[in-house]
């Protein structure tokens, strides 16, 4: 599939809105073009699956507990991890513009979680979000608050 355009409008609209909903083609592959454009623009991109995250607010902004699977008679343990935003912000290169969290399978997120991502991107200007909300014949995006 030939991609028309350089992806500059995508990066520009993400910088303007802070959070975008993206609809990609069913065969996939075209979103890699936009991932490369974001990296080329100076952003550190983190791709995550939306399935199995749990509480999105605690996962992104506060320390959260993770319980590994118990195999047999092993003890039940809970490991606590720092917030994902702080974890990746600590490893950012000095010249990076910020973080972009790219959520695929975003159709499983509720409206409340999507509005939280919009609010978080407005509060913290160094963090942006791209959420894949569905499939279309050609790739398109729109601000997440209007999706």
From Swiss-Prot:
Subcellular location: Cellular thylakoid membrane
Domain of life: Bacteria
Pfam family for this entry, one: NdhN
Entry GO MF terms: oxidoreductase activity, acting on NAD(P)H, quinone or similar compound as acceptor; quinone binding
E.C. numbers: 7.1.1.-
InterPro entries in alphabetical order: NAD(P)H-quinone_OxRdtase_su_N
Membrane protein topology class: Peripheral membrane protein
UniProt KW Membrane keyword: yes
Reactions catalysed, as given in the entry: a plastoquinone + NADH + (n+1) H(+)(in) = a plastoquinol + NAD(+) + n H(+)(out); a plastoquinone + NADPH + (n+1) H(+)(in) = a plastoquinol + NADP(+) + n H(+)(out)
Cellular component GO terms held in the UniProt record: plasma membrane-derived thylakoid membrane
Keywords on record: Membrane, NAD, NADP, Plastoquinone, Quinone, Thylakoid, Translocase, Transport
Protein function: NDH-1 shuttles electrons from an unknown electron donor, via FMN and iron-sulfur (Fe-S) centers, to quinones in the respiratory and/or the photosynthetic chain. The immediate electron acceptor for the enzyme in this species is believed to be plastoquinone. Couples the redox reaction to proton translocation, and thus conserves the redox energy in a proton gradient. Cyanobacterial NDH-1 also plays a role in inorganic carbon-concentration.
Family statement: Belongs to the complex I NdhN subunit family.
SUBUNIT field: NDH-1 can be composed of about 15 different subunits; different subcomplexes with different compositions have been identified which probably have different functions.
Name used for this protein in its record: NAD(P)H-quinone oxidoreductase subunit N
Organism: Synechococcus sp. (strain JA-3-3Ab)
């Amino acid at each position: 599939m030939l991609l028309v355009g350089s992806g500059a409008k995508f990066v520009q609209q993400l910088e303007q809105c802070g959070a975008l909903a993206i609809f990609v083609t069913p065969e996939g592959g075209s979103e890699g073009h936009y991932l490369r454009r974001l990296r080329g623009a100076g952003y550190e991109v983190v791709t995550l699956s939306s399935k199995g995250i749990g509480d999105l607010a605690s996962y992104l902004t506060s320390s959260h507990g993770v319980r590994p699977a118990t195999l047999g008679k092993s003890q039940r343990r809970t490991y606590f991890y720092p917030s994902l935003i702080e974890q990746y912000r600590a490893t950012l290169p000095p010249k990076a513009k910020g973080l972009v969290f790219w959520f695929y399978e975003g159709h499983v997120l509720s409206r409340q979680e999507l509005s939280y991502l919009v609010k978080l991107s407005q509060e913290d200007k160094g963090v942006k979000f791209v959420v894949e909300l569905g499939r279309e014949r050609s790739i398109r995006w729109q601000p997440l608050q209007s999706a």
